Amino acid sequence: MMPASNPKKNSSERRIVFHVDMDSFFASVEVRERPELKNLPVIVGSDPKGGSGRGVVSTCSYEARKYGIHSAMPISQAYRFCPDAVFLPVNMKLYAGVSAGVMEILRGFAEKFQQVSVDEAYLIPGSGVRNFEEAALYALRIKDEVQRQQKITCSVGVGPNKLVSKIASGFQKPDGLTVVRPEDVRDFLFPLPVSRIPGVGEKTEETLKKMGINRVEELANCDVQMLSEKLGKMGFRLKQLANGLDFEELVEKESVKSISRHGTFAEDTDDPVKVSGSLDLLIESVHGSLMKHSFLFKTITLTVRFEDFSTYTRSRTLSIWTSDVFVIKRTAMQLLSEFTGRRKFRLVGVGVTKLRERDERQTLITDFP
């Protein structure tokens, strides 16, 4: 354990950090726009085409989740699970506009603010919130204001650091509020599966299970040298997190040089539908970030990793700057074609670089229908 005199620890213990996470964001926005969809299973993603469509689920309503449907599921499988669901295409322009409105509300409640995606953000309130009792009331005000102005719900986690507040926000979804005081952090974290710790993906979870580590408490109490031997530097970091120690500060704005997303398949696959569908979802996420930041790009990069862990990247630079999602899709699929039919894929990723802020006075060719 770090010494009590460590200034970072003292700062972390004094902090009250909020994590605000919109509930089933894309689907909730669609229901807001079309109230007749309320209480129906709504799935946002690719066209299912009678169960033979390509692509994956972007998000779905909580009613759809009752059928076992979840994000990143192949859209054809979602159709088989619930053929009567309402399937809608991704409308990133609509979601980006709502996101901007939500984030503006949250900034009004924050002394420090960090948006981390189109539908979630961290904030630290001002000095008027002096303890966790006041923080709970403050969180209710945030939730009420988002509901009043945007007509959608969010879940809020409150804790002494980013780690705890992030996990807490997912505890009572949808429309939830979970407050974890510093003295309750271990009681809150220890019963959880290790997969709830950020950074513990499927492969890391598998490694930990082979070590006999299934719950956060077991990770917290594991010998750090043993963890380091199995996981390298990440082992020490995971032990810290399992003990509720997170000294990461909120970063209000960083200079963005690139935007990328990657995803690892649950099982290595050579199924072109799964590969292209997952890539399509990653592209939509990249494009959402582009729109959020009002960026144009000039270079598209594809990353693939095969079952033997060999990794390759391919890039293509355009002659003009653009923000067109179809340019990303067309280029990425062309780059992907070089690798299809070789081996099983373990990971795919896509990114854009050579970014610049869009001048709103400009009119791009892609702005016209």
Swiss-Prot record:
Residues 17-201 form the UmuC domain. It holds the Pfam family IMS. The active site is at E120. One of its GO terms (molecular function) is DNA-directed DNA polymerase activity. It is found in: Cytoplasm. Signal peptide: none annotated. GO terms for biological process: DNA-templated DNA replication; error-prone translesion synthesis. Keywords: Cytoplasm, DNA damage, DNA repair, DNA replication, DNA-binding, DNA-directed DNA polymerase, Magnesium, Metal-binding, Mutator protein, Nucleotidyltransferase, Transferase. Mg(2+) binds at D21, D119. InterPro entries: DNA/RNA_pol_sf, DNA_pol_Y-fam_lit_finger_sf, DNA_pol_Y-fam_little_finger, DNA_polymerase-Y, DNApol_IV, PolY_HhH_motif, Rev_trsase/Diguanyl_cyclase, UmuC. Monomer. Poorly processive, error-prone DNA polymerase involved in untargeted mutagenesis. Copies undamaged DNA at stalled replication forks, which arise in vivo from mismatched or misaligned primer ends. These misaligned primers can be extended by PolIV. Exhibits no 3'-5' exonuclease (proofreading) activity. May be involved in translesional synthesis. This is DNA polymerase IV 2. It comes from Methanosarcina mazei (strain ATCC BAA-159 / DSM 3647 / Goe1 / Go1 / JCM 11833 / OCM 88) (Methanosarcina frisia).
